[in-house]
Swiss-Prot record:
Species of the source: Grus nigricollis
Subunit structure: The cytochrome bc1 complex contains 11 subunits: 3 respiratory subunits (MT-CYB, CYC1 and UQCRFS1), 2 core proteins (UQCRC1 and UQCRC2) and 6 low-molecular weight proteins (UQCRH/QCR6, UQCRB/QCR7, UQCRQ/QCR8, UQCR10/QCR9, UQCR11/QCR10 and a cleavage product of UQCRFS1). This cytochrome bc1 complex then forms a dimer.
Protein name as catalogued: Cytochrome b
Compartments, as annotated in UniProt: Mitochondrion inner membrane
Recorded GO CC terms: mitochondrial inner membrane; respiratory chain complex III
Binding-site residues, heme b b566: H98, H197
Keywords: Electron transport, Heme, Iron, Membrane, Metal-binding, Mitochondrion, Mitochondrion inner membrane, Respiratory chain, Transmembrane, Transmembrane helix, Transport, Ubiquinone
Transmembrane portions of the chain: 34-54, 78-99, 114-134, 179-199, 227-247, 289-309, 321-341, 348-368
Superkingdom: Eukaryota
Length: 380
């Protein structure tokens, strides 16, 4: 009998073991779709980004007009740009849901997979930030100024660090050039990290909604989950196309229709919606260094998830107390996102401070306490 090329060829064998004959738990739900959706997002962003980069000029005098030229004169340039800008939003929606799934079902106990995932999130955030600066509109410029300025909070070397990042004494042409370089480079780094992430995942196999070992009940990934994932793609591509074609500027900032002007500060400087929760935490602390540390901690706290797991059960499926805590955390993040978009005025300041405090309290204090308490209640 002739050997099956899919299983014997050195390259095809790897693809086969990752996407075709991969043994998968039979009971994983639609929440396990987001990994492959993130892969689709990455591929779409790299493709549209490559086409945009072909028409973009990384120079302060030309950047804004080169983006306008792409939208007006390049064949389907408007569509490519709208897909790229809104694709970033969908990338973040998917990654946040993917992380939420990981927290809910205890997937963070696969420590290597989880840690590479958090590094992926940080790289994605960096990529999105430098990408937002490239159109060189008002919010691009002032967003870059405000966020890079945070490095000056680092004791002793802060100011040097900022000037080194800027390539001068303010955000200017060198800054734009290096941000374009980084924005081009980082997605390929994300691709590499994704492969590492998948390698670690396939070492242990997927988790499942019950959080129990499922070796006795595995099914091949193709055709079952490849088909299920295709449905997920449809569900993501439909709203993405709707957004890109009907209201492409819904999630953008109107300030970005004005070319960057260092002499005029916009009334409200705020990042894209997917960074608002972290921005709210940054703003809620009146001290600069404290704010920067809280901002970093808001994301880096994910590294601690495996250490804060005290329950004998892996998932939250059969833990109502923990579920209550999880959905409180979700609501809290939505409140932080909303507060981040509001001006720094009376009710919003205190709401932001309370929401920030609640965020860290739930993750650092209540998660381990409730986990231990549930063990007691179940006589574990």
């Amino acid at each position: 009998m002739a050997p099956n090329l899919r299983k014997s060829h050195p390259l095809l064998k790897m693809i086969n073991n990752s996407l075709i004959d991969l043994p998968t738990p039979s009971n994983i739900s639609a929440w396990w779709n987001f990994g492959s959706l993130l892969g689709i997002c990455l591929a779409t962003q790299i493709l549209t980004g490559l086409l945009l980069a072909a028409h973009y000029t990384a120079d302060t005098t030309l950047a804004f007009s080169s983006v306008a030229h792409t939208c007006r004169n390049v064949q389907y340039g408007w569509l490519i740009r709208n897909l790229h800008a809104n694709g970033a939003s969908f990338f973040f929606i998917c990654i946040y849901l993917h992380i939420g799934r990981g927290l809910y079902y205890g997937s963070y106990l696969y420590k290597e997979t989880w840690n590479t995932g958090v590094i992926l999130l940080l790289t994605l955030m960096a990529t999105a930030f430098v990408g937002y600066v490239l159109p060189w509109g008002q919010m691009s410029f002032w967003g870059a100024t405000v966020i890079t300025n945070l490095f000056s909070a680092v004791p002793y070397i802060g100011q040097t660090l900022v000037e080194w990042a800027w390539g001068g004494f303010s955000v200017d042409n060198p800054t734009l050039t290096r941000f374009f370089t980084l924005h081009f480079l980082l997605p390929f780094m994300i691709m590499g990290l994704t492969l590492i992430h998948l390698t670690f995942l396939h070492e242990s196999g997927s988790n499942n909604p019950l959080g129990i070992v499922s070796n006795c009940d595995k099914i091949p990934f193709h055709p079952y989950f490849s088909l299920k994932d295709t449905l997920g793609f449809m569900f993501m591509l439909l709203p993405l196309m709707t957004l890109a074609l009907f209201s492409p500027n819904l999630l953008g900032d109107p300030e970005n229709f004005t070319p960057a002007n260092p002499l005029v500060t916009p009334p409200h400087i705020k990042p894209e919606w997917y960074f608002l929760f972290a921005y709210a935490i940054l703003r809620s602390i009146p001290n600069k260094l404290g704010g920067v540390l809280a901002l970093a901690a808001s994301v880096l706290i994910l590294f601690l998830a495996p250490l804060l797991h005290k329950s004998k059960q892996r998932t939250m499926t059969f833990r109502p107390l923990f579920q209550l805590l999880f959905w409180t955390l979700t609501a809290n993040l939505l409140i932080l996102t909303w507060v981040g978009s509001q001006p720094v005025e009376h009710p919003f300041i205190i709401i932001g401070q309370l929401a920030s405090l609640t965020y860290f309290t739930i993750l650092l204090i209540l998660f381990p306490i409730i986990g231990a308490l549930e063990n007691k209640m179940l006589n574990y």
